[in-house]
Design a protein with these regions (language model features):
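Eukaryote-biased, non-catalytic alpha-solenoid scaffold regions
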Residues: 1-186
Length: 186
């Protein structure tokens, strides 16, 4: 009851609201009230706490699970949204997110490379690296491009080598860039 009163009093203060929700979580966890525990886990997820996803999912009845997950995907903050996509292996939504924002490839590429979207994901990653390289104009930006290339090589070593060669040919006069490529093993 105290935690509910605290939530009501602090609705305008998100940080305190979450603290009260966590108090309720611990109370319901100890008393074994599964339905209330599921509700508070969902509230915490909507508040941006991805750590409660697996427990929330385990508390949802099987017949409602897919509907509730889809509903949560529509309302979830980005941290929770990403957690759900990875946990549920929703490669369709991962690919969509990468089309909108190629930087999401750093998070989703390893899942996408083993999916029907593998070829498109590889193209997007290569284009993203090339585009970033085109805009780079100092050593720290070259180093950032090379780190992206190194991350790409962990999942696609052959494509990364080809791309590194393409970058060498495209920017032969940018000595600092070539040095940064060597530093990361290209």
């Amino acid at each position: 009851r105290l935690a509910l009163d605290g939530e009501y009093e602090n609705q305008a203060l998100p940080g305190l609201l979450q603290e009260w929700q966590k108090c309720r979580y611990h109370c319901y966890h100890r008393t074994g009230e599964r339905e209330k525990l599921a509700d508070v886990c969902e509230a915490l997820l909507k508040g941006g706490e991805p750590d409660y996803y697996e427990e929330w999912k385990s508390l949802i009845p099987f017949d409602l699970k897919s509907v509730k997950i889809e509903q949560l995907l529509k309302e979830a903050p980005i941290k929770v949204y990403r957690k759900i996509l990875l946990a549920e292996n929703r490669v369709d939504l991962m690919a969509e997110a990468c089309e909108k924002d190629p930087s999401e490839l750093q998070l989703y590429f390893s899942a996408l490379k083993c999916s029907p979207f593998a070829e498109r994901a590889t193209e997007l990653y290569e284009d993203w690296i090339l585009d970033t390289a085109d805009r780079a104009f100092n050593r720290s930006e070259y180093a950032a491009v090379c780190q992206k290339l190194k991350t790409f090589s962990e999942n696609s070593p052959i494509a990364a080598r080809v791309l590194a060669q393409e970058l060498r040919e495209k920017f032969p006069r940018k000595r600092a860039f070539l040095e940064e490529l060597k530093k990361v093993g290209f």
